[in-house]
């Protein structure tokens, strides 16, 4: 089967990183909307997607944000999967996903990088990678959750092309995102 969709598109890849509740998902939606308005196909991918799928089966989580078992997800992802099974488990899955989706999408947005290697490995592997650091408020986490490695590993990591401080209205945030995207080629 041949056609445009079977040719690798060499997509722009955005790697979004920041603490929980900093606005990563909202910013991702703005990026998708921006490119879709230019008739380009955009998709968001999450390192945490497989963890969430495991949680749905293991503890019958309903998948809703309001009932998110954050402690369980942190333990499953770090203590079991990264520490006991494969330190690059999620990165390898993401790289495989990028390879597949590169045939179908012009823009790929990784919405939830939490560790240095989750940013650096895609950055080194692909040609058009834009790293965006998000700073915002994560005050609704417990102290234990705030101290988890997935919340602290990037505290002193400042490798990025763009930084967004999410401290205003949604309209202001959208303007910040659009200004960045106007610069990206």
Range-by-range predicted roles:
Residues 43-105:
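ATP-dependent small-molecule kinase phosphotransfer cores
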Residues 93, 123-125, 131-185:
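Small-molecule kinase domains that catalyze NTP-dependent phosphoryl transfer to phosphate-bearing small molecules
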Residues 27:
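Hydrophobic positions on the alpha1 helix immediately C-terminal to the Walker A/P-loop
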Residues 1-5:
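Short, Lys/Arg-enriched N-terminal segments with co-localized hydrophobic residues
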Residues 24:
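Conserved lysine of the Walker
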Residues 16, 110:
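Hydrophobic anchor at the beta1->P-loop junction of P-loop NTPases
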Residues 19:
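P-loop (Walker A) phosphate-binding loop of NTP-binding proteins
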Residues 33-43:
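Post-Walker A helix-loop "phosphate-sensing" segment adjacent to the P-loop in P-loop NTPases
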């Amino acid at each position: 089967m041949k056609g445009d969709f079977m040719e690798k598109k060499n997509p722009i890849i955005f790697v979004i990183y920041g603490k929980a509740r900093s606005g990563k998902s909202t910013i991702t939606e703005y990026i998708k909307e921006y490119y879709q308005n230019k008739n380009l196909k955009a998709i968001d991918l999450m390192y945490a997607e497989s963890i969430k799928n495991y949680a749905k089966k293991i503890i019958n989580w309903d998948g809703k944000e309001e009932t998110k078992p954050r402690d369980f997800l942190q333990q499953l992802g770090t203590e079991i999967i990264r520490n006991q099974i494969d330190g690059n488990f999620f990165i390898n899955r993401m790289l495989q996903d990028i390879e597949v989706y590169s045939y179908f999408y012009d823009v790929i947005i990784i919405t939830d990088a939490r560790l240095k290697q989750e940013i650096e490995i895609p950055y080194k592997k692909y040609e058009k990678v834009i790293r965006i650091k998000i700073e915002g408020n994560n005050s609704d986490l417990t102290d234990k959750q705030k101290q988890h490695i997935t919340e602290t590993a990037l505290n002193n990591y400042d490798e990025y092309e763009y930084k967004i401080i999410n401290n205003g209205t949604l309209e202001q945030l959208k303007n910040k995102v659009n200004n960045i995207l106007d610069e990206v080629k």
